[in-house]
Amino acid sequence: SCSILFSGTTQVSGQTIYTAEDRDIKGAETDYKKLEKDLDKKIKRTPTDHPGYDEYQYHLDEITHDPWQLTSFLTTLYDDYTRSEVQGKLKETFKKQYKLTTWVEVQTRYRTVVMIDIFTGIPYTTQVPYQYKIFHTKLENRGLEVVIREELTEDQWKRYEIFQDTKGGRPYLFKGGLPAGGSDGSGTPGIDYTVPAEA
């Protein structure tokens, strides 16, 4: 009877506490933020990587994720994971969360020019068409938890929610779960990141 009680207690405890080492949890979080920073850099390089356009327009969702969601997700899938073991899953999840697309819009615009009548020598104005090229960059962030929900079974999702409620027994890890990156909401490609000191 005592053995059964102990076994049950151990199981519940295991379902509420992160089992990976702090360094691996923070390491995986750092690696995911690195993917986000690389994405931000790619967006900022758009005029350099795609020169020769008259205008660059950006349609950007915020680049951000909740580190608690990522850690609870990885723990649900792998339990006592190491930083190196989850590299493939980090990249796979990142590709599902973010979608970057680009396209070119060509507009026909008109400019006013002054011409000289060859017969009378009198100047006059006319409209001359020209092409105006706009390079569009769009970033969609589906949200990390949307991706997580699609990945997990019902039983796994319940376990994930427990980790979220308990913060895996380690509330000190991310200081309340500040997002990995932020945006000023202006729709410009410049995204300012605030990296926690412990990362």
Question: Language-model features: where?
Answer:
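Membrane-proximal envelope biogenesis segments
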Residues: 1-198
